[in-house]
């Protein structure tokens, strides 16, 4: 009986191993499907952006109290504490601002996968250091290290979305989803950090974020091969970042991204003290004042994506309208006397920012497509620089303006700058007018693949557009390169 049972057990084990191998091959094949792979990469990028913004904001309710305890031990003054908090908040954006030109060039040369993995690993290390930091110097190092990780993860993530989703409507939709995750991370992090800090201690919020970051990195490794030489061999030569910076259309978009984020960046470090002195706000009110703004932000993203799908030539108008809404809302903030009243202008600011970001981030990729080479690392490094300028100045400059001029003057100035900048987006109108014809032309192209990820897109295009002829009109006058350069970049799906 034992002699006949052993072969049966062995055969059963072989069959089970064979079935497991078959399931693994099926899973690997499913992950290699272009559409599914593209969606998984969108999930990876959105989680990375969520983590970065949660880590940026989760320290808001934790660090002041933690540094106050350290101050009690060392006898530092309250003024020194305010300076330490301001420098700590600004250090991330400052380092991100310095590293972005280098990270953008690096992304253009090696692709999007490896820089995203590097960014996630650095963010994981930064989060772990935050969890176990015991002094201000270590906290400062962790905060600065987060800026280094963000320069790689944020830029490569947004650039990867632009590269994978090349049709204008789906690109706007994918970038809109990413922006919703950014907003959710920024707004939910303070209550998340405050609750866990209150009931579980300082380390727990950071350990949770570190675990999610590690899981996101593992998911990225299952979807792509960041160390593959094939990707780097197929990379077209991108336009240098200094040439993109002097492009007038890209400069207008970068300026708008900076200006529209100034109210949010300047109000975050100043509004709590103003609420306490003006309306005697409680701690929970100061902690939750931004949370209701999440819904208007998501609504703004949704509306802009739907409008961009139907009227892509009006992207400049959506951005200009958003800046006017931001300006008007910023001017009304000082007039609020209660917590309920204050929620409305803050919602207006976030709604306007959603309009501007959702309209202009896809426009940056489109500008690179029609005027340069379709490689997006450097152009989205410029976008990240624009955000970093606002958030680097916020914690340092806003407090000085409030101290010297007053909170009312700060808000009126921010509102006026946004309203005055809005007409500058009229300069984008000629470029936005060609969006429908350019999108149609790219959809009908049938040349062979030559750029990054073009093979995947060619397969998708053959499946979706089978039987269509390649005879659309041309837009040579608006392209800043020859036909060979034009087709070397990623093509539309």
Swiss-Prot record:
Transport recorded as keyword: yes
Pfam families assigned to the protein according to its UniProt record, in alphabetical order: MFS_1
Topological domain spans for side Lumenal, vesicle: 61-86, 135-143, 196-203, 269-284, 337-347, 400-406
GO CC terms of this entry: AP-1 adaptor complex; AP-2 adaptor complex; terminal bouton
Chief location category: membrane
Keyword Iron-sulfur in annotation: no
GO biological process entries: chemical synaptic transmission; establishment of localization in cell; serotonin transport
Record topology, Cytoplasmic segments: 1-39, 108-113, 165-174, 225-247, 306-315, 369-378, 428-493
Recorded topology in the membrane: Multi-pass membrane protein
Stretches for region Disordered: 467-493
Molecular function (Gene Ontology), one example: xenobiotic transmembrane transporter activity
Glycosylation site residues: 76
Membrane-traversing stretches: 40-60, 87-107, 114-134, 144-164, 175-195, 204-224, 248-268, 285-305, 316-336, 348-368, 379-399, 407-427
Keyword entries, A-Z: Glycoprotein, Membrane, Neurotransmitter transport, Transmembrane, Transmembrane helix, Transport
Subcellular location per the Swiss-Prot or TrEMBL entry: Membrane
Biased composition (Acidic residues): 483-493
Known role: Involved in acetylcholine transport into synaptic vesicles.
Cited NCBIfam families: 2_A_01_02 (TIGR00880)
Similarity remark: Belongs to the major facilitator superfamily. Vesicular transporter family.
Protein name (database record): Probable vesicular acetylcholine transporter-B
Taxonomic source organism: Danio rerio
Gene behind this protein: slc18a3b
């Amino acid at each position: 009986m034992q002699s006949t049972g052993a072969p049966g057990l062995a055969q059963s084990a072989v069959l089970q191993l064979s079935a497991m191998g078959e399931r693994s091959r099926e899973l690997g094949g499913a992950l290699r499907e272009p559409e599914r792979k593209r969606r998984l990469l969108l999930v990876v990028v959105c989680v990375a952006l969520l983590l970065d913004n949660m880590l940026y904001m989760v320290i808001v309710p934790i660090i002041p109290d933690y540094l106050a305890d350290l101050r009690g031990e060392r006898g530092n003054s309250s003024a020194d504490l305010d300076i330490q908090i301001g420098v700590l908040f600004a250090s991330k954006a400052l380092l991100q601002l310095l590293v972005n030109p280098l990270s953008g060039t690096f992304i253009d040369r090696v692709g999007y996968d490896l820089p995203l993995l590097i960014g996630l690993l650095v963010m994981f290390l930064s989060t772990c250091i935050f969890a176990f930091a015991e002094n201000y110097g270590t906290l400062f190092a962790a905060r600065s290290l987060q800026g280094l990780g963000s320069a790689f993860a944020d830029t490569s993530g947004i650039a990867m979305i632009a590269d994978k989703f090349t049709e204008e409507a789906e690109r706007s939709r994918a970038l809109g989803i990413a922006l919703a995750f950014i907003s959710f991370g920024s707004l939910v992090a303070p209550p998340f950090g405050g609750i866990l800090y209150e009931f579980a201690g300082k380390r727990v919020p950071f350990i949770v974020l570190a675990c999610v970051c590690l899981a996101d990195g593992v998911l990225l490794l299952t979807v792509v091969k960041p160390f593959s030489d094939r990707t780097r061999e197929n990379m077209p030569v991108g336009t240098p970042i200094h040439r993109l910076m002097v492009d007038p259309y890209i400069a207008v978009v970068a300026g708008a991204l900076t200006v529209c984020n100034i109210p949010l960046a300047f109000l975050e470090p100043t509004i709590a003290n103003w609420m306490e002195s003006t309306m005697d706000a409680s701690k929970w009110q100061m902690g939750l004042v931004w949370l209701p703004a999440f819904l208007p932000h998501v609504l703004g993203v949704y509306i802009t994506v739907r409008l961009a799908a139907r009227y892509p030539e009006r992207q400049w108008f959506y951005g200009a309208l958003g800046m006017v809404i931001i300006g008007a809302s910023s001017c009304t903030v000082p007039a609020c006397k209660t917590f309920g009243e204050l929620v409305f202008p803050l919602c207006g600011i976030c709604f306007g920012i959603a309009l501007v970001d959702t309209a202009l981030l896809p426009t940056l990729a489109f500008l690179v497509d029609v005027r340069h080479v379709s490689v997006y690392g450097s152009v989205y490094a410029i976008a990240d620089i624009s955000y970093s300028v606002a958030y680097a100045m916020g914690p340092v400059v806003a407090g000085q303006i409030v101290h010297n001029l007053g909170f009312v003057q700060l808000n009126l100035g921010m509102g006026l700058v946004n309203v005055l900048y809005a007409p500058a987006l009229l300069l984008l109108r000629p470029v936005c007018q060609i969006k429908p014809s350019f999108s149609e032309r790219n959809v009908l192209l049938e040349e062979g693949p030559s750029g990054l990820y073009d093979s995947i897109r060619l397969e998708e295009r053959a499946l979706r557009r089978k039987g269509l002829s390649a005879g659309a009109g041309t837009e040579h006058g608006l392209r800043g390169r020859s036909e060979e350069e034009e087709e070397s970049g990623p093509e539309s799906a």
